[in-house]
Amino acid sequence: MNRNSIHLGGRPVSRRTALALGLGASAAAMLSGPSLAQSVTLRYGHNNEPASVAGAQADWFAEAVAKYSGGDLAVEVFPSSQLGKLQELAEAVSLGTIAFSHNTAGGIGSLYEPFAALDTPYLYRDVDHLMKVVDVSSPVMQELNEGLIKAANVRVIYAHYFGRRNLTANKAVYSPADLAGEKIRAVPFPIYTTAVEGLGAAAVPVDWSEVPTALATGVVAGQENPVNVILNVKLYEVQSHLMLTGHMSNAEVVVMNEDAWQGLSDEHKEAVTKAAVEIRERATKAIQENEEKDTRALRDLGMTVIGPEEGLKIDAFRASVDKLVQERFGEKYGALYEKIRAIS
């Protein structure tokens, strides 16, 4: 056996991968074969609060993996950016220092650029269309997953609906003209800064862990996120207005280190796959069921909610965003956009 590898379920894996599975260096050096196969722990780091659906689904996934593996395979979850910020978490999965994380498609685009196209604003007809595109068995996702594995040693295991992203600010906004000169927080990836600039604002990249402070101190005047995030993080305490721009329909993409995946036994792979199918559906359903309720809750908590009925000019936002997307990404992602639109 290579002195820099161990055996997991009968398969050789690197010491780095063993550490990604949550084993200490001494344990990784001493254990091999059947003893490791009986008990494996994989680390899952993410940036969301445990109370949010995005955070809770990681815990649900851990529970489902334990259930389907008969307790032989454990997933240890580290929420709230304990193991790093968004970019750091993406890189940690690629390097193998953790086994799992979840991220936006735009964030995963930092590992394999074409992936970011999945987060293009105003791209999907509806939620059903989005979920068909990001199903791991769809032709689009299969193509992207193959590229991601080759480029970054990372594979997608599932993607759940994350919500429609909406704008918040401390003033009423009805059209792109109302955002001229306003500094709005953007997820620190190009497709997101483009979305915010397309809405009419000046995009300020800020990591999620720093957003509440940035809003409270005036570093940025607003931000954009699904309503479940706005509610769970209590952004209504520092933002007075919610604009239902719905400019992005997002999937949260759960990824796994490829070496860690290949190091699992067939039985453990099956447990992960079954858990992925179950939690994708559960998380998607939870977010869909809560969107209207969460919007009402934000209104009840004092936010002024502005939608088309209140004069929000969705067509103007769409036209402005589409123009900028075409300028920046039309040539790069045009063929992929056509494949996405062709899925029915």
Positions of the model-derived regions?
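N-terminal secretory/targeting leader peptides
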Residues: 2-13, 17-26, 36-131, 144-344
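N-terminal signal peptide c-region/cleavage motif recognized by signal peptidases
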Residues: 32-34
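An acidic, glycine-rich surface segment that forms the CoA-thioester-binding/catalytic face
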Residues: 135
